[in-house]
């Protein structure tokens, strides 16, 4: 397992490495305290680490995964005095004390804060976020390695390998991504033994009318299609080429209308069918391209969304691959595992990681709007460095409504 740094370079301060104001602006102290109260995790007595400080600590852990627990806390406490009562004297506790504080907090309030705050952020002026009147979102999933502890293995499982088992247990997660901003939202996480489709069903409450959701062929099934369609969002999903699709009406743009059915039993008498539009195309001259691509969409009128545009649009789905790469590589750095040693704290750390990614993407979106640029043209790695770099102290001053943070 990769070693963590015992300490940051000499002379380091929190303002050299993190602008807590960016995180606190995204996750205001008042919201954090409301969530803690709702989940019964607010500090009832004076502790070395108040619960709301631990929340920010969990997010900071995601930004500094190569630093030790104690070093992240030391630096954090240098920069969060406005979170504390002026008379508080919070000491930099050891690894055991930090673990106890995180265990008291648990995963529930972190997930609740994530679910309450993390959502699409694109506005009308956001470049690359829209196709005609639709907000573009994609659905996909991935896995992350977690610490090689028996409790984690029992809770999450580990993948097989050509020579025995994989070195690390893994969690699986499925997320929606806002294509234009790369914000991951509606994220669901479980052990590796849980399939992507089961997790994907948990993302559906975040699909809304006015969205166009793109997804790969492995998510398609009649039941899940109907559940996603019921959200009011429009769908553009790839399906396997062996799916039987009858051309019932050829349209001027080359696409055609057809029906999908709950089962083969319903297909023969054409019973309980649902109308779809089918787009089929090839990628000539593209290395590694498959012989045929087939897409289904809920948008039946070709004038609203012509087939050539939808075919090109589908490949926007790979925006989520960029977001997953940011999460797994650029934000985590060289570390190969989430370091928490119990299943509860793994989930806590995971949602802290998701919130750190959201805070960075929010900062990048603001910068893109000011520069009138597509957020894709900005560097995620550079944004991480900006948040870690020394910034003026005033961004860390809480908004007027959060002036009672010492209580």
Task: State where each predicted segment sits.
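Major-groove recognition helix of helix-turn-helix-like DNA-binding domains
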Residues: 85-105
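A short, well-structured juxtamembrane/interface segment
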Residues: 118-126
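Short helix-terminating capping/connector loops at secondary-structure junctions
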Residues: 90, 130-131
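Single, function-defining residue in the core of a domain
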Residues: 1-69, 75, 103-105, 112-116, ...
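DNA-recognition alpha helix
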Residues: 68-87
């Amino acid at each position: 397992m990769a070693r963590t740094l015992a300490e940051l370079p000499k002379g380091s301060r929190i303002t050299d490495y993190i602008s807590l104001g960016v995180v606190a602006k995204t996750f205001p102290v008042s919201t954090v305290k409301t969530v803690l109260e709702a989940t019964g995790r607010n500090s009832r007595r004076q502790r070395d680490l108040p619960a709301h400080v631990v929340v920010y600590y969990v997010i900071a852990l995601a930004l500094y995964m190569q630093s030790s627990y104690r070093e992240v806390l030391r630096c954090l406490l240098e920069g969060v005095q406005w979170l504390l009562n002026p008379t508080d004297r919070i000491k930099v506790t050891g690894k055991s004390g930090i673990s106890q504080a995180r265990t008291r907090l648990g995963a529930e309030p972190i997930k609740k804060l994530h679910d309450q705050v993390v959502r699409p952020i694109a506005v009308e002026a956001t470049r690359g976020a829209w196709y005609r009147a639709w907000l573009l979102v994609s659905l996909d999933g991935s896995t992350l390695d977690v610490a090689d502890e028996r409790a984690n293995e029992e809770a999450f499982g580990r993948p097989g390998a050509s020579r025995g088992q994989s070195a690390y247990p893994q969690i699986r997660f499925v997320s929606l991504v806002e294509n234009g901003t790369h914000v991951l939202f509606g994220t669901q996480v479980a052990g590796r033994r849980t399939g992507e489709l089961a997790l994907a069903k948990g993302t559906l409450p975040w699909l809304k009318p006015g969205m166009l959701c793109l997804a790969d062929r492995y998510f398609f099934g009649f039941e899940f299609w109907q559940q996603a369609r019921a959200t009011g969002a429009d769908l553009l999903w790839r399906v396997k080429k062996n799916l039987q699709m009858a051309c019932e009406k050829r349209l001027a743009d080359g696409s055609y209308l057809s029906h999908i059915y709950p089962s083969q039993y319903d297909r023969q008498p054409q019973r309980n069918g649902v109308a779809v539009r089918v787009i089929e195309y090839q990628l000539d001259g593209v290395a590694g391209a498959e012989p045929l691509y087939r897409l289904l969409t809920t948008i039946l009128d070709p004038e609203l969304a012509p087939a050539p545009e939808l075919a090109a649009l589908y490949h926007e789905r790979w925006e989520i691959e960029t977001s997953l790469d940011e999460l797994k590589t650029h934000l985590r750095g060289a570390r190969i595992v989430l370091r928490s040693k119990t299943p509860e704290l793994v989930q806590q750390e995971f949602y802290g990681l998701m919130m750190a990614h959201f805070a960075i993407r929010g900062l990048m979106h603001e910068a893109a709007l000011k520069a009138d640029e597509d957020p894709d043209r900005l560097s995620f790695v550079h944004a991480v460095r900006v948040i870690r770099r020394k910034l003026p102290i005033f961004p860390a001053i809480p908004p007027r409504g959060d002036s009672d943070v010492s209580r």
